[in-house]
């Protein structure tokens, strides 16, 4: 069966962080699928002393007039603080994350802000490897930035679109891939890759 043609990806800026002296955006991504509305990562909703040195400037989903109730499924690419800080807004709804990522976030010190991961009512669905989330929507492990990082592959036509989280932090990491995850994403021959900390999607260089 062919994937639906009407799957769209929309980036939403939810924060800025100070990294190496420059402001770095934080985006989450909404995937509108005929069968469900999927949110990839949840950004941040509050400040925390553990990341005060990054001078977060927040514009969380719940302050943007975003339709929180309209989200059916949440995917965490990984559980660093700037990707899971809004998980509590979706308490009771399924949040898909790789089991290894969840285990690391729960057991390793200084990995994340643990109270954000373990917010009351948050319901994780641990994933082991690849998973077809919906027709035309796949979760694929892409280790590198973290051991349990995953990306979302959207089959929209001849070539897929990837929502990659931090599989790469900047475009050069996909231009010249090194990690297992980056190599795996490039092997998909994607049309474009949305990243958390870039304003525009990465596209393959044309000769």
What is each residue range found by the language model?
Residues 45-46, 55, 59-82, 97-141, 147-207:
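Metallo-beta-lactamase
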Residues 11-14, 26-32, 38, 128-157:
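Core dinuclear metal-dependent hydrolase active-site scaffold
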Residues 94-99, 162-165:
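Short hydrophobic/aromatic-enriched beta-strand-loop microsegments
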Residues 85-91, 204-206:
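Metal-dependent catalytic neighborhoods of phosphoester/phosphodiester hydrolases
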Residues 1-39, 44-47, 178-192, 201-207:
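Zn-dependent metallo-beta-lactamase
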């Amino acid at each position: 069966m062919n994937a639906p043609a009407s799957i769209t990806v929309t980036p939403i800026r939810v924060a800025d962080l100070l990294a190496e002296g420059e402001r770095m955006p934080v985006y989450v991504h909404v995937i509108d699928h005929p069968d469900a509305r999927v949110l990839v990562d949840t950004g941040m909703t509050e400040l925390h002393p553990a990341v005060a040195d990054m001078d977060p400037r927040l514009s969380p989903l719940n302050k943007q007039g975003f339709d929180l109730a309209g989200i059916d499924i949440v995917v965490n690419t990984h559980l660093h603080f700037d990707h899971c800080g809004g998980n509590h807004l979706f308490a009771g709804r399924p949040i898909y994350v790789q089991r290894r990522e969840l285990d690391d976030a729960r057991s390793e010190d200084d990995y994340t802000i643990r109270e954000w991961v373990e917010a009351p009512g948050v319901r994780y669905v641990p994933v082991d490897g690849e998973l077809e989330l919906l027709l035309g929507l796949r979760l694929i492990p892409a280790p590198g930035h973290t051991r349990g990082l995953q990306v979302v592959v959207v089959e929209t036509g001849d070539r897929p679109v990837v929502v990659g989280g931090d599989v790469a932090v900047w475009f050069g990491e996909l231009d010249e891939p090194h990690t297992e995850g980056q190599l795996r994403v490039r092997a998909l021959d994607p049309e474009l890759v949305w990243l958390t900390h870039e304003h525009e999607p990465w596209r393959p260089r044309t000769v």
